[in-house]
Design a protein with these regions (language model features):
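C-terminal output helix
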Residues: 103-114
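Active-site residues of response regulator receiver
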Residues: 53
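Short amphipathic alpha-helix used as the core "switch/output" element in two-component signaling
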Residues: 40, 62-72
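Charged docking surfaces used in two-component/phosphorelay signaling
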Residues: 16-24
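The feature encodes the CheY-like receiver
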Residues: 15, 57
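Acidic catalytic/metal-coordinating carboxylates
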Residues: 33-34, 60-63
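Short hydrophobic/Thr-rich beta-strand motif most characteristic of the beta2 strand and flanking loop
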Residues: 26-33, 41
Length: 120
């Protein structure tokens, strides 16, 4: 059975890109536009890993990460941002990895592979 990844990003083209690229790697990918009902969605969908944008229009990804950690402490989370200014904060908020958003998903795929080992 394929590992399930939840991609949370407010930009539709990013969600689509990540979903297509990660599906090609053998993962089952589900997406969310933001943090509304995110904890309930995680409870229902039971993803193996979350890829979480930090800067979203209606939600702060760092706050969402804390909420995820409080309820699903062992769920791997990779933070993504177009800015590298959050890299130092990542350690203090307990994200598993931090990657800079890019159309080349090599780094993201590597980090996902490290956390999930094999895609299927």
């Amino acid at each position: 059975m394929a590992k399930k990844i939840l991609v949370v990003d407010d930009e539709a083209h990013i969600r689509m890109l990540y979903a297509e690229e990660l599906a090609e790697e053998g993962y089952e990918v589900i997406t969310a536009e933001g943090g509304l009902n995110l904890l309930e969605r995680i409870e229902r969908e039971k993803p193996d890993l979350v890829v979480l944008d930090i800067k979203m229009v209606d939600y702060n990804g760092l706050d969402l990460l804390q909420d995820i950690r409080n309820k699903f402490y062992d769920l791997p989370v990779i933070l993504c941002s177009a800015y590298d200014t959050f890299k130092d904060d990542m350690k203090s908020i307990a994200a598993d990895h931090y990657v800079i958003k890019s159309f080349d998903l090599a780094e993201l795929k590597t980090k996902i592979g490290e956390l999930l080992e094999d895609p299927a």
